[in-house]
Amino acid sequence: MMDKSHPKMIRTSLSTFLKNHNFIVKEGLIALLICALGDLVAGIILGKMTFFLKMFPGLLVLIPGAIGMRGNIFGSFASRLSTNLHIGIISPKFELSDDLNHNIFASFVLTLFLSLFLAIVAKGLCLLFNFESISIFDFVIISVLAGIISNIIMLPITMFISFKSFKHGWDPDNVTTPIIAAFGDLFTLPAIIISIYILRFINKF
């Protein structure tokens, strides 16, 4: 015989869960809405990049990896900051310390290494599938410069979001990753455009 109390128990458990974890839902929802908005803006920027994509064939192979890499690197950076804030290793202030310096250095090293790796893979895929593409030199310059530019922008933004959310009683683990992913999407494409202009300037000499 079916126990008629089960639906009531489920509803009670769900309402209790939502009541006890309301802050998680609120923080996560706000962060995801910002992430969705950032992705929409990034899509608009990409739609305006057709001129550059025609001028630099093969660049479209590089872009998805560059966007994903930025979110992964700084999402991890934000997670490490959150952990260090929770256990008291660092304070939510823009003050350099050994732990913060190590995290910043690791982010720069990862960005440089993965940008170089991404450029080589993008060129390799273009050759493998017989796509028309720019030279490996151009791939490397665009990828590495875009990585450095994004790094300079994303580091203070990541620290600001982590520190501010922690100061205001929000759990950085709930808000930083989606928001950082949105900013990564948003700034990677303009960084690539700036890198293209720098490359065009270099090619004049």
Language-model segments: what does each one mean?
Residues 164-185:
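Interfacial loop-to-transmembrane junctions
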Residues 60-62, 159-162, 174-175:
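Short hydrophobic "helix-edge" motifs at membrane interfaces and signal-peptide entry regions
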Residues 184-192:
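Alpha-helical transmembrane segments that form the membrane-embedded catalytic/substrate-binding core
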Residues 2-144, 148, 169-170, 182, ...:
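Alpha-helical transmembrane segments and their membrane-interface boundaries
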